[in-house]
Curated annotation (Swiss-Prot):
Name the record gives this protein: 3-octaprenyl-4-hydroxybenzoate carboxy-lyase
Pathway field: Cofactor biosynthesis; ubiquinone biosynthesis
Gene designation: ubiD
CC cofactor: prenylated FMN; Mn(2+)
Gene3D superfamilies membership: Single helix bin, UbiD C-terminal domain-like
Catalytic activity: a 4-hydroxy-3-(all-trans-polyprenyl)benzoate + H(+) = a 2-(all-trans-polyprenyl)phenol + CO2
Subunit structure, as described in the record: Homohexamer.
Annotated organism of origin: Shewanella sediminis (strain HAW-EB3)
Membership in a protein family: Belongs to the UbiD family.
Amino acid sequence: MSFKDLRSFISHLEANGELKRISHPVDPHLEMTEIADRVLRAKGPALLFENPVGNEMPVLANLFGTPKRVAMALGKEDPLALREVGELLAFLKEPEPPRGFKDAISKIPMFKQALNMPPKTVRNAPCQEVIKTGSDVDLTKLPIQHCWPGDVAPLVTWGLTITKGPRQKRQNLGIYRQQLLDKDKLIMRWLDHRGGALDFKDFKEKFPGERYPVVVALGADPVTILGAVTPVPDSMSEYAFAGLLRGERTDVCKAISCDLEVPATSEIILEGYIDPEEMAEEGPYGDHTGYYNETDKFPVFTVTHITHRKDAIYHSTYTGRPPDEPAMLGVALNEIFVPILRKQYPEIIDFYLPPEGCSYRMAVISIRKEYPGHAKRVMMGAWSFLRQFMYTKFIIIVDEDVNCRDWNDVIWAITTRMDPKRDTVMIENTPIDYLDFASPVAGLGSKMGMDATNKWEGETDREWGTPIVMDEAVKQRIDTIWDDLGIDDAPTL
């Protein structure tokens, strides 16, 4: 099942018991965060606050609060099925020519999907049913959440920021938090390596001093939203990838004030520009690390037009100590990363980003070890292969007999198969998340790799231990007589 807009997905979730309407008045100032946080930690439903205090516009929260709902947004019922998306991405990153007629036939489904890539331009788009300009532009009339007590101001969290660089054929979609600064101004917090910031940098170099057109879409269809957080090849538009996932082209329309294309079924569109000379101090805000971050200067986004659907819905979230919504997205996207990594490194058995590691700061990888030093090759490859792992501080490599998603297994491997000096790799002066205050310099810090695999000849002079494993025939014999032993339920092994 595919969803052309956010409303159809809301209806689908509600019909399947995955969305709860809240009619009781709830304040966007702190109260929504507390409710959404409790519900998410209980693995509860998405929430539609129908009566936000001080506003008539409903607020949608906790939309992707479980990996299951992320899968549902992409037409899947099980998060493991998201590996199909990863296989598609792996193919797009490095398409292989058919090895023969049968192989060509097997690739036809992927080629058919590729035909759905170009977005479809439409007129009379739902997102432009209501148009506000001039003095009618007032961001304070949106029910923007103020998430945490120490936050400096309300924060736009789920906006899809749409940009285009002068050297790029495709548009870029990215999700960057935006601090409410004034009735018509937001602070655009994008880091230097992100797509929007790179487009802006190229524009400033080619057109110094000129205003840079920017559009922000709120409440886009779920597939387009997820396309913006997926490791799409640099040469491909997120709109095109969303069309691939949906199985039909993404509807877009031209913005009113510039040539950028916006998701046609979005709930709200903010149009405007960034003046390269206008910067403002952003923060502090509570973030996905579980801490308030430092303040810094970022560009100011001036909003000149607001368009929206009739009876628009405001899509919002909060970020905090895991688990939060970004952490749940990370759990689901984990399944997409596995086939992409395996394409480059077939020896990888599994890959895990533990949500308590703030989604990406730690990775555990199990491999089919084939030679001495193999673990170090894989950890170096993981750090460099995808931009998403640029900020991963810790990588642990284990053997295929270790479940990399089970901390009991992983800790056992670390404590029995590692020598701290020999098997630890330290790399200094590497890119680190700006929000990581533990690093000695903002944006620059170290990384640690841990080789928790069995050591081969050449890696150790010692006789290596043999794991204790019970005789399989004995295990089967005990299984057959267990009920006769009068012992309570057998532990799950």
